[in-house]
Amino acid sequence: MLPEDYEESEAPYADASQAVFATIFFVVWESDSFWLHVTTSYSQYIPSSIRNALFLVFTVAGGYMGWMAHEQIFGVAREEAELVDYGVYGLSRHPMYLGIMTVFLGLVVSTASVAAMVVLLGVFLFYHYLASYEEMKLVEFFGDRYVAYMARVRRWV
């Protein structure tokens, strides 16, 4: 729980923007992968068994990471603000974002959609911006403890 006078730690319109980027990704991925087939010609060079295995690995790993990150932050009632730097937050400073992008990567690999990969690059840049903004706010709030965490744990992987 943050003090009442503490500025919002999320970037403005972060939630709505995430929904917009996810929608764009899914529309492009589904349209290209199942209807238009404009940029999926590379799928013929990668056996479906390999694409399916990678899809399974990326989506399960990303989904698990995102879920565990969500549970670590929102699944526990806290009386005071706490720097969560253990569990999946000991592997990545932004495991929820990383989990979402890993699931998206699994979808891209499953159909080899270049168009969806380009959108995923945009999603990454967006999440990189969000992470930078949030880290600036977290350094303001937690100070040297968060700076030490940043030195110890990478932003992504």
Tell me the role of every PLM-derived stretch.
Residues 92-93:
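Conserved SAM-binding loop
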Residues 96:
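Active-site His/Glu-centered metal-binding helix of metallohydrolases
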Residues 1-85, 99-157:
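Membrane-anchoring alpha-helices and their flanking helix-loop junctions
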